[in-house]
Amino acid sequence: QYLVSDFYLKLRSVMPKNGYCIMGITWTDLYPKEELNFVLGEASGAHKSGVFSFGRFEPKSYNPEMSSDIFEIDEKILWRLLKVMSHEVCHLFGLSHCEYFLCAMNESTSLHEAMSQPLFLCPVCLRKLQTVCKFDLIQRFQKLETFLSQLKRSWYIPEIERSIEWLQRCLHFCKEGDTDNSDGFAE
């Protein structure tokens, strides 16, 4: 088990000059400080770096004799990687833990809590990220849909299919508005 902050300076030293931040991935379990026994991931805005571990996900799968081990992941691990990495990268863009809605930025104290959170940001956190990154919302949803659709061609992950469907509903709403009228109100 490694102290997560020990990675920050090393990661920062290998970050490309034109990079905004850098993330490290390890199979070895991490802990954030002596008082806490584990963390799935952590990011430091000051160091513009973060790290997350598969140690809690698949502790028996780590083989120190095989350096290629990190590339031999299955669908379950890939889904977890997407969720934890996107959460930590959002920290690097200045987002803190969300207390408003069900959100990718909710704090978690267990693997179960982390995996029960959505992949996507709530409206409050999405707006915060949009303010920092200056992205077009529709283009962002389209790029996420394209990325997840490409993953879907190579991996069978039911959560990806549901995520694509959610993105398609968001895109439809952004482009067409709410045409359902199921609330009973006339336009």
Language model feature labels by segment:
Residues 46-80, 96-187:
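Metalloprotease/metallohydrolase-associated module, dominated by Zn2+-dependent proteases
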Residues 1-86, 92-96, 101:
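Metzincin-family zinc-dependent endopeptidase catalytic domain
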